[in-house]
C-alpha cells in the first residue's frame, strides 16, 4: 500500500513510531507517518531527530514547493489528504489511510513532484529552510509545518495545543504528538500544499497561507484539538505567510555571472554581442571587428578566423541576457545611441529605429521601471452565480502601478489586507495571464515580465483566487474573504466538534464512529460555519466513513463553502445550509449544480469524499491501481486522484488540483451519491466507472469541457457527465443510486450542460480522453460521436448537417457555375462543412457536438466515419460534379471551362458564355463565344471551352485563383487556406485505400485539378517560355492591358479566342491567344483539346460520374486547368493530370498544343506585356483621338482579328491586333526577337531595339504556328481581308460583335477623352494602341492596335490638335491624298512602299504622339516623339503642320513608298519566317489599317510629314526624303536587329527593316533622341514591339494587296 516514497520514508516513520509509540494506533503512525512522513519525512523524522530539520521540512511542507517537500509533500500531501484530521484521522483511517496513502501518495507524488519541480522547489526550500530555522525546533516542527515559519512564541503555543490535543487524543509523547500534529498539520498544510503543489507557485503563498492555513488547517484539526492552537496558529500563520511570502531563493550575485557577460577585449559588458561560430566565444561587435582587422585569431583562443569570410554571427539571445542581467545597461546604451545619432542627422536618417536608440521592442526592463497591472478575482463565474452586493466590488479588476521589483508576495499581501482575508484560514494564489499559471511568491514583476514576455502593450493581467487552505480534503473553490470573527468562531466550533469527534474517533477508530460523528458533525455544522462542516467531512472521511448522506451534505456544504467562501456571508450560509445534513443537500445541491457548471467551464477538479471504509474497500482494489495509473497518466490531476482515491485521495485532490485545473473550482463531490447516503459498496460499483471518471476528471483538470455523451452504461454516461463535477463524483463514488441522484443534480445543476454541453464537452473530452483514457471512453466515444459529431460540426452545420450535405451537393454545382456563386457555396460547404461531418455523424450515427470536437472525432473515427465523411463532401459535390460532367460532359472543353470558371460552366454549361462574360466583361464574353463558335469548330468546342475557357481564362487568370480558392474552400468548407488545394480536404475525409468502398478515385482528381489550377498561373511559361510573366499577368489581371489587360473590351474580343492566355488580361490576353491561332490552341488548350479532348472529357465525365467525385469545384478547376493551363502547363500539367489515373484531365490535347501554344502564348504574352506597359500611354492619348475614326479602326481591327480567329487561327488574327504587330516584327526581326524574349525587362534602349525583336520573334513563332491556322485563313480568307478592310466585320462579325462593346468604349474613349483613355488601357486595345502609337501607321493596320492606332492618330490629332488641330486638319487632306495614293500603291505590287510611307505617315502620327508623349507617356508614338527629341514638336508640329503642305506630305509619302519598296521586299523576305498566311493576313491587316490611317491618320500623316520636314530642317535631318534615305540603309543593314534599334524608338514595327522612308526618318530622329525616348519608350517600346510587328507586317499586307 505504501508508495516507494512512503516505504523509503518508513525508516523515518520508524523513528516517528518510536517517538510516537504512545500513539494509539501504530498503524496510524505508520500510515500517517509514512504518508505524512513523506510530508513530514524530514519534518516528522527530523522532529524526533533534528528540530532544525523539522523547521526546514516544515518549511518544505508549508512551502509546498520545496524540493524536500517534493518527496515529502508528494507523499505527505497524498497522505495528508487521507490523514487530514490529524489524530482522529489517524485512528480512524489507519488502514484506509495506508491504502489511500499509497494511492494518494502515488498520484500526489506524481502531481506534487511535477508541480514542485515546476515550482523551483529547491530554491524555495533553501529560503524557507532559513526561515524555518528561525522557528523553535521541536515545537517549531509541528507548528512550522503548519505555519511555515511561525515565531517561536506562536510555535510554542501551537506546540502546546498540539501536545495537549495529542495527550487528549492518545497519550503520546509530546514529541510524537508534535510529530502527529505536525504531520497532521503538515499533512493538512501539505495537503493544502499538495493542492498548492498542484499549483506549485500559488502553493508557496498557499502553502504559506496553507501553512498559515496549514496552521489553520492543522489548527482546525488542531483547533479541533485546541482552540488556543488555532488562535496561535492563525496569528503565526499570518506572520508565517509574510515570512513565506518574503522567502525566496538565494539571489545570485551579478559578480558570479560577470565573467560570462563581459567582452574580453574591452572588459565591459557585451554590446551587440557577436559570437565566433567555431569557438563560440562572444565579444562586442565593434571590438571583434577591430580585432579581426589586426589579427586572424580568436581573442580568447587560437581558433583561426577567415578574414575574408569571418564566421561570426550576431548573438541576440546573449545580448538580451546581458541587458536583462545588468540593471540600467540597456537604458544607458540607448542613451549612447541617441547621443551618437543626434550629432549625425545624415546617418540617423539611414539608421533603423533600433540603431538610433529607439526602444521598439520594450522587452528590456529596469528595476526602476514602473509596471502597470490589473488584479482581478479569478473565479468571477462563481461569484456571479451566488454573488452578493458586497462581492460586486470584487468583480472589477484593480489597476495598480508598481515598481518592477514588486513581488508576488506583495500582491498577495495587498489582497489579504484589501479584503481583510484571514491568512490563517485562506490562501491566495496569484496567477498571470491564465488562471493556471500560479506565480511564486518571490517572483518580481520584472521576473514575470521576462518569463511571460510582457511587451508593455497593456497592463499585466493578474488574477487571484482565495481558497480555504486548512481543508486538506476539499480544495475550496476560491474562497472569498471571511471576517476574522466568523473564521475564529467557526474554528472554535470546529475545534469543539473536533474534540467531540476525536473522542468518538478514539472510541471507534474505524467506521463505527461514522454515525456518531456524522450526527455530531451534523449538529456542529448546523450550529457552526461551513468550515466546520468541511472539518467534519474531513473527520468523517478520515476518521470513519460517515453516512453517505452526511458526506453528501458535507461535500455540498463544501461546495457551497467554496462558492460562498468567497464571502463570509456565503460561508455562513453554507454553514447554515450544511447544518441540516439531509436538508443541506437540497439547498447545497443548487450550489453544487452551479459549482459543477463552473467546474465544467473551469475544469473543476472533483475531489471524491468517501468514507475511509470505502477508501479501504474501493481504493485498494481498483481505485489504487487506477488512481495510480491515472495519476501517472494525468500527472497529478486532482480529478483523477480524487476519483481514484475516493475519500482520502479526494481530500488530497481537493487541495492538489493540478496547476492546470482551477483549484478553487475543485469540488470534491466525492461519493456524494445522493442527498441520502448510498451504500459504501457504491464505490466498488463505481470503480468500473471509476476508471473512466478519473479520466474525465483528469481531463476536467485540464480545463477540458468534460461533457460526455451518455451512451454506453449509465455509469459511463455519468462519467461522461463527469463534465458536471457532481455527477462524476457521484459516478465515481456512488453506485447507480448515486448516479440517479447525480443525474438529478447534474441535470438540475446544469441540464443544458449535462445534455447538450455534454455532447460538446464530451466530444472534446473524447478527443483528448481517448488518447489518455481507457478503452472504455473510446467505447463511449464511438457512440458519443453521434452527439459529439453534431457538436463537432461547425456550429453552422451542427443542425443542418444532414440537409447541409444535400444542399451542398446541389449548390456546389451552381458555385462552380459562377465564381460569385462559388463563394457563397463555398461558404455553404464551409458552413456546411457539415457535409463531410454529416456523413460522419450520419454514418457513424454520431451527433456533431462541438466544431472543435468534431475534428478530433473525425480523426479518431476516420476508420469509422471515413466512408460517410469523405463521400459526403464528394457526395455533396459529386452531384455538382456530375452536373458539371453532364453539362460540360458533352464537351470536354465545357468541363474544363466550367471547372475553370469555378463550376460556372459545370452548373450552367450553356451559361458558360454568361459566366465567361461575367468573369471578364459581359460583352466580350458573348462575342468571344460567338466568334469562337462561329469562327471555328474549335470555336464551338472552344465556344464551350473558350466560353468556359475564355471566361475561364479570364477567370482562370483573374477568377482562376479565385476559383481555385473557391473550389478548395468548397471541398474544405473554408478549411483550406486560399492557396491550399482540395487535397487539404482530407482532414474531414480520411484517405481510403483504393480497395475501400469509400475510396474516391475522382477525389484525387480534384486534388490534381486543384494543383493544375495552381500551375495555371504558371501557364505563362507554358504559353511561351518568354511569356511566363505575361501569362501570370494575364492570369492575375490582364496580361495585356497593364494587367487590367483591358477591362476585357479588347481582350475579350480576342480573349474569347484568346481566353487561354489570360482572358482576364482583356485585350492583352486576347492578343496573346490571337497571337497564334494557337492563341486559342495554346492558351485555350481547348483548341486542340476541343476535338479529341471532348472524347477524353466525356471520359472524364464518366470518371466523375462513376467516381461520384465530390470535388465539383476542384474538378472543374482541374479541367479548366487543362484548358486554361493547356497553353503553358500542357506539358507539365498534362503529365500531372495523366499521372493520376483519375485525371480525366488527361483530356489532353495539351501536349499537342504546347509547341504552338507555347510560342503563341509567348507571343501573346509578349505582345500582352508590351501593351500592358503601354496601356497607360494609350489611355492618355486615347482621349484626344477622334472617336469616329478611332471607333472604325478598332472595329475593323476587331473584325480583322475576329476573321483570323474565325479561321482555325481565328486567334492569331485577333492576336494580330497585338499579335499581328508582333508577326511583322517577327518576320523582319524574328532573329533579333528570338534574342530579346526579355523585352519587358530590357532597358529602354534595349526594349526599343529588342522589344520589337521579341515581338517579331513571337510573331515569327506565331506566324510559324498560327499562319496555317489563322494567318492563312485570315489573309487568304475573304473574311480576313474583309476584316482587314475596315468593314471586314463580316467574318469578324463575332469578333466585331466582341469588339463592338470594345469599340463603343473606344468611341467613348476618344469622346470621353480623359475618361476613356483609362478605359482604353483596360480595353486591351490600349496595349495594342501603344504598339500602334509606336508604329503610328502599322498600329492602325493592326486589328487591335489599329483601333488603338486610329485612336492614337485621332488622339494625337486631339492632343496635338488641341493645340494645332486646325493645322492638322488642314494637313489631313494632303495626308489623305497621300494615303489614297498609298492605297493605290498598295493595290499595286508596289503598295508595300506606299504602305510604308503610310507607315511613315503613321510615324508622324506617332511622333505627334511623342509630342503628346508627356501626356500619354511612353506610348510608342510618344517613344518616337521622344526619340525624335521632338517633345517640343507639339509646338513645332502646330506651326509645321500649318506650314507643311499636302505636297510635302505627298513627297514624303512618295519617298517613303519608294524607299519602302525595297524595304517591303526585304520585309517580305523576312516575312518568309512568317507563314504566307501571316503575310496575307498582315497585308490585309495593313490594308485595313492603312485605310484607317488614311481616314483617321491623314491629318496625322500630314502633320507627321510636316513634322519630318521640320525635324529635317531643325534637326539637320534634311528633307524627309533625306531622312528616309539614311534610314533605308540602316533598315537594310540590320534588317532584323540593327534597324529595330534605330526604328524601335519610334517604329519598333518597322525596325525589322520594313521601316518605310517616312517611318525611317522619324526613326532616325528618334534614334537621335532614342536615349531619352527609350527610357520613356521602354514601356512604349513594349507597346512598340507590339506595334512594330504591324509595321513590319505592313509590307506583307501591302504586298498581298
Swiss-Prot record:
PROSITE patterns per UniProt: ZF_RING_1, ZF_RING_2
Any one Gene Ontology cellular component term annotated for this protein: nucleus
Extent of Gly residues compositional bias: 1036-1045
UniProt feature, compositional bias: Basic and acidic residues: 611-637, 1247-1258
Top-level taxon: Eukaryota
Residue list for modification Phosphoserine: 656, 658, 1139, 1253, 1266, 1274
Main location class: nucleus
Region Disordered, annotated ranges: 1-91, 165-245, 561-693, 711-856, 895-960, 1011-1097, 1116-1315, 1330-1408, 1512-1601
Subunit architecture: Component of PRC1 complex, which contains many PcG proteins like Pc, ph, Scm, Psc, Sce and also chromatin-remodeling proteins such as histone deacetylases. This complex is distinct from the Esc/E(z) complex, at least composed of esc, E(z), Su(z)12, HDAC1/Rpd3 and Caf1-55. The 2 complexes however cooperate and interact together during the first 3 hours of development to establish PcG silencing.
InterPro entries: RAWUL, Znf_C3HC4_RING-type, Znf_RING, Znf_RING/FYVE/PHD, Znf_RING_CS
SUPFAM superfamilies xref list: RING/U-box (SSF57850)
Record-listed Phosphothreonine modification sites: 1222, 1236, 1251
Subcellular location: Nucleus
Bias (Pro residues): 812-822, 1204-1217
Protein name: Polycomb group protein Psc
Residue spans of biased composition, Low complexity class: 8-91, 182-198, 228-245, 567-590, 638-649, 729-739, 1011-1022, 1069-1085
Biological processes annotated in GO: anterior/posterior axis specification; chromatin remodeling; heterochromatin formation; negative regulation of gene expression; negative regulation of transcription by RNA polymerase II; regulation of transcription by RNA polymerase II; syncytial blastoderm mitotic cell cycle; ventral cord development
Pfam families: RAWUL, zf-C3HC4
Start-end of RING-type zinc fingers: 263-302
Keywords (A to Z) from UniProt: Developmental protein, DNA-binding, Metal-binding, Nucleus, Phosphoprotein, Zinc, Zinc-finger
Gene Ontology molecular function terms on file: chromatin binding; DNA binding; promoter-specific chromatin binding; sequence-specific DNA binding; zinc ion binding
Composition bias, Polar residues: 199-215, 676-689, 929-938, 1116-1133, 1261-1272, 1352-1375, 1561-1587
Amino acid at each position: 500500500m505504501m508508495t516507494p516514497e512512503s516505504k523509503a520514508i518508513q525508516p523515518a516513520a520508524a523513528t516517528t513510531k518510536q517517538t510516537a509509540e504512545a500513539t494509539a494506533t501504530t498503524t496510524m503512525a505508520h500510515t500517517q507517518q509514512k504518508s505524512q512522513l513523506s510530508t513530514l519525512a524530514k519534518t516528522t523524522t527530523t522532529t524526533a531527530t533534528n528540530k532544525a530539520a523539522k523547521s526546514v521540512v516544515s518549511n518544505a511542507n508549508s512551502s509546498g514547493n520545496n524540493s524536500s517537500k517534493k518527496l515529502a509533500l508528494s507523499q505527505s500531501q497524498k497522505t495528508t489528504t487521507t490523514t487530514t484530521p490529524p489524530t482522529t484521522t489517524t485512528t480512524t483511517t489507519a488502514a484506509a489511510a495506508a491504502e489511500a496513502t499509497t494511492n494518494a501518495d502515488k498520484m500526489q507524488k506524481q502531481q506534487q513532484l511535477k508541480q514542485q519541480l515546476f515550482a523551483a522547489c529547491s530554491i524555495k526550500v533553501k529560503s524557507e529552510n532559513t526561515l524555518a530555522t528561525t522557528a523553535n525546533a521541536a515545537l517549531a516542527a509541528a507548528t512550522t509545518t503548519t505555519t511555515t515559519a511561525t515565531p517561536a512564541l506562536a510555535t510554542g503555543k501551537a506546540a502546546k495545543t498540539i501536545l495537549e490535543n495529542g495527550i487528549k487524543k492518545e497519550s503520546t509523547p509530546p514529541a510524537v504528538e508534535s510529530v502527529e500534529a505536525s504531520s497532521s498539520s503538515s499533512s493538512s498544510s501539505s495537503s493544502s500544499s499538495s493542492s498548492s503543489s498542484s499549483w506549485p507557485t500559488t502553493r508557496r503563498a498557499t502553502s504559506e497561507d496553507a501553512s498559515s492555513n496549514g496552521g489553520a488547517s492543522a489548527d482546525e484539526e488542531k483547533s479541533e484539538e485546541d482552540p488556543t492552537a488555532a488562535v496561535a496558529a492563525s496569528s503565526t500563520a499570518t506572520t508565517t505567510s509574510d515570512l513565506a511570502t518574503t522567502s525566496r531563493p538565494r539571489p545570485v550575485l551579478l559578480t558570479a555571472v560577470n565573467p560570462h557577460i563581459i567582452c574580453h577585449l574591452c572588459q565591459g559588458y557585451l554590446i551587440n554581442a557577436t559570437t565566433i561560430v567555431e569557438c563560440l566565444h562572444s565579444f562586442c561587435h565593434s571590438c571583434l571587428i577591430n580585432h579581426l582587422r589586426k589579427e586572424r585569431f580568436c581573442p580568447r583562443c587560437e581558433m583561426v578566423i577567415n578574414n575574408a569570410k569571418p564566421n561570426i554571427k550576431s548573438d541576440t539571445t546573449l545580448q538580451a541576457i546581458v541587458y536583462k542581467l545588468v540593471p540600467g545597461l540597456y537604458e544607458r546604451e540607448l542613451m549612447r545611441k541617441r547621443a551618437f545619432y543626434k550629432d549625425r542627422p545624415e546617418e540617423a536618417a539611414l539608421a533603423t529605429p533600433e540603431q538610433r536608440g529607439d526602444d521598439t521592442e520594450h522587452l528590456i526592463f529596469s528595476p526602476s521601471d514602473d509596471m502597470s497591472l490589473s488584479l482581478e478575482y479569478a473565479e468571477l463565474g462563481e461569484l456571479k452565480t451566488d454573488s452578493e452586493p458586497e462581492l460586486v466590488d470584487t468583480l472589477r479588476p484593480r489597476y495598480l502601478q508598481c515598481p518592477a521589483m514588486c513581488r508576488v508576495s506583495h500582491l498577495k499581501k495587498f489582497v489579504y489586507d484589501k479584503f481583510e482575508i484571514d491568512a490563517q484560514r485562506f490562501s491566495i494564489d496569484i496567477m498571470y495571464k491564465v488562471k493556471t499559471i500560479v506565480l511564486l511568491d518571490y517572483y518580481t514583476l520584472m521576473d514575470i515580465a521576462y518569463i511571460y514576455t510582457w511587451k508593455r502593450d497593456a497592463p499585466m493581467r493578474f488574477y487571484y483566487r482565495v481558497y480555504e487552505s486548512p481543508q486538506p480534503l476539499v480544495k475550496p473553490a476560491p474562497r472569498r474573504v471571511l471576517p476574522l470573527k466568523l473564521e475564529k468562531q467557526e474554528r472554535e466550533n470546529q475545534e469543539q466538534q473536533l474534540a467531540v469527534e476525536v473522542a468518538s474517533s478514539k472510541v471507534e477508530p474505524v467506521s463505527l464512529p461514522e454515525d456518531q460523528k456524522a450526527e455530531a458533525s451534523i449538529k456542529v455544522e448546523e450550529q457552526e460555519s461551513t468550515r466546520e462542516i468541511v472539518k467534519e467531512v474531513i473527520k468523517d472521511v478520515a476518521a470513519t466513513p460517515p453516512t453517505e448522506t452526511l458526506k453528501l451534505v458535507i461535500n455540498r456544504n463544501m461546495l457551497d463553502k467554496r462558492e460562498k467562501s468567497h464571502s463570509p456571508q456565503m460561508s455562513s450560509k453554507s454553514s447554515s445550509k450544511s447544518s441540516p445534513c439531509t436538508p443541506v443537500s437540497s439547498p447545497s445541491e443548487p450550489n453544487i449544480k452551479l459549482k459543477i457548471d463552473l467546474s465544467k467551464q473551469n475544469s473543476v477538479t472533483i475531489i471524491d469524499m468517501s468514507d475511509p471504509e470505502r477508501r479501504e474497500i474501493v481504493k485498494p482494489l481498483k481505485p489504487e491501481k487506477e488512481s495510480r495509473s491515472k495519476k501517472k497518466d494525468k500527472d497529478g490531476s486532482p480529478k483523477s486522484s480524487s476519483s481514484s482515491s475516493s475519500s482520502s485521495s479526494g481530500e488530497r485532490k481537493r487541495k492538489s488540483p493540478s496547476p492546470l485545473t482551477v483549484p478553487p473550482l475543485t469540488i470534491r463531490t466525492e461519493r456524494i451519491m445522493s442527498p441520502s447516503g448510498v451504500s459504501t459498496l457504491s464505490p466498488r460499483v463505481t470503480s468500473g466507472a471509476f476508471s473512466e471518471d478519473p479520466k474525465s476528471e483528469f481531463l476536467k483538470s485540464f480545463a477540458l469541457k468534460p461533457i460526455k455523451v451518455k451512451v454506453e452504461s449509465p455509469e459511463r454516461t455519468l462519467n461522461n457527465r463527469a463534465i458536471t463535477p457532481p455527477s462524476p463524483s457521484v459516478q465515481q463514488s456512488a453506485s447507480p443510486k448515486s448516479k440517479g441522484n447525480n443525474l438529478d443534480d447534474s441535470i438540475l445543476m446544469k441540464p443544458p450542460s449535462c445534455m447538450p454541453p455534454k455532447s460538446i464537452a464530451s466530444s472534446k473530452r473524447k478527443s483528448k480522453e481517448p488518447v489518455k483514457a481507457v478503452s472504455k471512453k473510446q467505447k463511449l466515444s464511438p457512440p458519443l460521436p453521434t452527439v459529439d459529431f453534431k457538436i463537432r460540426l461547425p456550429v453552422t452545420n451542427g443542425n443542418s448537417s444532414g440537409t447541409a450535405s444535400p444542399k451542398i451537393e446541389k449548390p456546389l454545382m451552381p458555385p462552380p457555375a459562377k465564381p460569385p456563386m462559388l463563394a457563397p457555396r463555398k461558404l455553404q460547404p464551409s458552413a456546411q462543412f457539415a457535409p463531410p461531418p454529416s456523413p460522419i455523424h450520419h454514418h457513424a450515427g454520431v451527433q456533431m457536438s462541438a466544431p472543435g470536437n468534431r475534428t478530433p472525432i473525425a480523426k479518431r473515427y476516420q476508420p469509422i466515419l471515413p466512408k460517410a465523411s469523405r463521400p459526403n463532401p464528394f457526395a455533396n459535390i459529386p452531384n455538382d460534379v456530375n452536373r458539371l460532367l453532364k453539362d460540360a460532359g458533352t464537351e470536354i472543353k465545357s468541363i474544363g471551362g466550367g471547372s475553370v470558371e469555378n463550376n460556372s460552366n459545370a452548373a450552367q454549361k450553356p451559361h458558360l458564355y454568361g459566366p465567361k462574360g461575367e468573369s471578364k466583361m459581359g460583352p466580350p464574353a458573348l462575342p468571344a463565344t460567338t466568334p469562337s463558335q462561329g469562327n471555328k469548330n474549335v470555336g464551338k468546342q472552344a465556344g464551350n471551352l473558350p466560353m468556359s475557357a475564355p471566361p475561364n481564362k479570364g477567370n482562370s487568370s483573374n477568377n482562376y485563383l479565385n476559383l481555385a480558392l473557391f473550389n478548395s474552400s468548397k471541398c474544405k468548407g473554408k478549411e483550406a487556406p486560399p492557396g491550399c488545394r482540395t487535397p487539404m480536404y482530407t482532414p474531414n475525409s480520411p484517405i481510403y485505400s483504393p480497395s475501400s468502398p469509400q475510396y474516391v478515385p475522382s477525389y484525387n482528381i480534384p486534388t490534381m485539378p486543384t494543383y493544375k489550377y495552381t500551375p495555371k498561373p504558371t501557364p505563362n511559361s507554358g504559353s511561351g517560355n518568354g511569356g511566363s510573366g505575361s501569362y501570370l499577368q494575364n492570369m492575375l489581371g490582364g496580361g495585356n492591358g497593364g494587367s487590367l489587360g483591358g477591362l476585357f473590351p479588347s481582350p475579350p474580343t480576342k480573349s474569347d479566342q484568346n481566353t487561354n492566355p489570360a482572358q482576364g488580361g482583356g485585350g492583352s490576353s486576347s492578343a496573346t491567344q490571337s497571337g497564334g491561332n494557337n492563341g486559342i490552341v495554346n492558351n485555350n488548350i481547348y483548341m486542340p483539346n476541343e476535338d479529341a479532348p471532348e472524347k477524353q472529357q466525356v471520359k472524364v465525365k464518366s470518371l466523375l460520374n462513376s467516381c461520384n467525385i465530390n470535388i465539383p469545384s476542384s474538378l472543374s478547376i482541374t479541367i479548366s486547368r487543362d484548358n486554361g493551363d493547356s497553353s503553358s502547363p500542357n506539358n507539365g500539367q498534362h503529365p500531372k493530370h495523366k499521372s493520376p489515373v483519375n485525371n480525366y484531365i488527361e483530356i489532353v490535347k495539351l501536349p499537342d498544343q504546347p509547341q504552338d501554344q507555347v510560342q503563341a502564348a509567348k507571343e501573346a504574352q509578349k505582345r500582352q506585356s508590351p501593351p500592358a506597359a503601354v496601356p497607360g500611354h494609350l489611355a492618355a492619348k486615347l482621349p484626344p483621338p477622334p472617336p469616329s475614326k478611332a471607333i472604325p479602326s478598332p472595329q475593323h481591327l476587331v473584325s480583322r482579328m475576329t476573321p483570323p480567329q474565325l479561321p482555325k487561327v481565328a486567334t492569331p488574327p485577333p492576336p494580330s491586333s497585338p499579335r499581328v504587330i508582333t508577326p511583322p516584327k517577327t518576320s523582319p526581326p524574328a532573329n533579333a526577337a528570338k534574342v530579346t524574349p526579355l523585352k519587358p525587362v530590357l532597358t529602354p534602349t534595349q526594349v526599343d531595339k529588342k522589344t520589337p525583336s521579341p515581338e517579331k520573334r513571337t510573331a515569327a513563332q506565331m506566324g510559324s504556328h498560327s499562319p496555317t491556322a489563322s494567318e492563312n485563313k485570315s489573309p487568304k480568307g475573304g473574311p480576313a481581308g474583309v476584316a482587314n478592310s475596315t468593314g471586314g466585320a463580316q467574318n469578324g462579325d463575332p469578333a466585331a460583335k466582341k469588339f463592338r462593346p470594345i469599340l463603343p468604349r473606344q468611341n467613348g474613349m476618344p469622346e470621353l477623352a480623359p475618361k476613356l483613355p483609362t478605359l482604353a488601357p483596360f480595353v486591351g486595345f490600349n496595349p495594342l494602341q501603344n504598339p500602334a502609337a509606336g508604329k503610328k501607321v502599322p498600329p492602325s493596320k493592326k486589328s487591335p492596335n489599329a483601333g488603338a492606332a486610329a485612336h492614337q492618330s485621332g488622339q494625337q490629332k486631339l492632343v496635338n490638335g488641341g493645340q494645332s488641330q486646325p493645322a492638322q486638319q488642314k494637313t489631313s487632306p494632303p495626308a489623305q491624298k497621300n494615303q489614297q495614293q498609298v492605297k493605290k500603291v498598295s493595290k499595286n505590287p508596289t503598295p508595300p512602299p506606299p504602305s510604308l510611307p503610310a507607315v511613315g505617315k503613321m510615324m508622324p502620327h506617332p511622333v505627334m504622339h511623342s509630342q503628346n508623349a508627356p501626356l500619354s507617356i511612353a506610348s510608342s508614338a510618344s517613344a518616337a516623339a521622344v526619340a525624335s527629341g521632338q517633345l517640343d514638336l507639339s509646338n513645332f508640329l502646330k506651326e509645321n503642320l500649318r506650314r507643311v503642305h499636302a505636297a510635302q506630305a505627298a513627297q514624303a509619302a512618295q519617298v517613303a513608298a519608294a524607299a519602302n519598296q525595297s524595304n517591303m521586299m526585304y520585309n517580305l523576305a523576312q516575312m518568309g519566317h512568317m507563314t504566307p498566311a501571316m503575310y496575307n493576313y498582315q497585308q490585309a491587316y495593313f490594308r485595313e489599317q492603312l485605310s484607317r490611317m488614311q481616314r483617321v491618320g491623314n491629318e496625322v500623316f500630314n502633320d507627321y510629314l510636316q513634322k519630318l520636314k521640320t525635324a529635317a530642317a531643325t534637326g539637320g535631318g534634311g528633307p524627309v526624303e533625306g531622312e528616309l534615305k539614311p534610314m533605308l540603309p540602316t533598315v537594310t543593314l540590320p534588317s532584323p536587329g540593327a534597324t529595330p534599334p534605330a526604328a524601335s524608338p519610334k517604329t519598333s514595327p518597322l525596325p525589322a527593316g520594313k521601316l518605310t522612308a517616312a517611318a525611317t526618318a522619324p526613326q532616325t530622329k528618334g534614334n537621335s533622341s532614342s536615349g531619352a525616348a527609350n527610357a520613356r519608350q521602354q514601356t512604349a517600346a513594349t507597346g512598340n514591339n507590339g506595334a512594330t510587328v504591324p509595321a513590319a507586317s505592313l509590307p506583307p499586307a501591302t504586298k498581298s494587296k
